[in-house]
Amino acid sequence: MFDQASYLIMRHLEFLNLLCEVSRLIIKYAAKQDVDRVSLESVNRDKIISILIGFHDQINQLFKNTPKENLKNLGLDEILKTWAQESEEKIEYVQALDIQILELLNQEKQKTKEDIQNVYLNRRKLGGYNLSNVK
């Protein structure tokens, strides 16, 4: 049980670190207005989150019916506390990155909206002129 718990916890923490890394990449690409890369990394991020949920569920299932005394005897109580603390810190960090991502995406959305509006207005201005018959 100890080995399985250690493995699951370490993998969970590795994927949390990967989630942070991918979130930083999304910020980098969003700042460069590289929409294709933002989309690609967002898909990767969603997959990582699904994997994290799976690991979290497995860890919870592993300790679901285990008395706290057994956890203490195995030395898992401190490991679980440390894991919970590290997970919480990473999640807070990812939430801060999410705010940055949303701000950058909203800026890009506003820019795109303005570009579309300008194209529309320019077409309306030129709409009175029939330029197809000009020699």
Range-by-range predicted roles:
Residues 75-135:
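Short terminal interaction segments
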